[in-house]
């Protein structure tokens, strides 16, 4: 997911997206531990997406813009 796509969402949607990404990361880590993960790069992608969402949430909080 690109940062420009994330910026279009409001804080409520971003928090929902963050929860979904965290649960996906949990599932991927579980698959990695049980040697069922086919694509290890997926972990990196999900972690970066979580960081992007958190960064944009913080930007919106600091700017006072809840859109």
Curated annotation (Swiss-Prot):
Record Pfam families: Ribosomal_L29 (PF00831)
GO molecular function, one term: structural constituent of ribosome
Gene: rpmC
A single GO cellular-component term on record: cytosolic large ribosomal subunit
CDD domains, alphabetized: Ribosomal_L29_HIP (cd00427)
Protein name: Large ribosomal subunit protein uL29
Protein family: Belongs to the universal ribosomal protein uL29 family.
Taxonomy, superkingdom: Bacteria
Keyword Isomerase appears in the UniProt entry: no
PANTHER family, alphabetized: 60S RIBOSOMAL PROTEIN L35/50S RIBOSOMAL PROTEIN L29, LARGE RIBOSOMAL SUBUNIT PROTEIN UL29C
Any Gene Ontology biological process: translation
SUPFAM superfamilies attached to this UniProt entry: Ribosomal protein L29 (L29p) (SSF46561)
Alphabetical keyword list: Ribonucleoprotein, Ribosomal protein
């Amino acid at each position: 997911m690109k940062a420009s796509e994330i910026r279009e969402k409001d804080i409520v949607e971003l928090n929902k997206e963050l929860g979904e990404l965290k649960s996906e990361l949990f599932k991927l880590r579980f698959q990695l531990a049980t040697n069922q993960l086919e694509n290890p790069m997926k972990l990196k992608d999900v972690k970066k997406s979580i960081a992007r969402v958190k960064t944009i949430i913080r930007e919106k909080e600091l700017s006072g813009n809840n859109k």
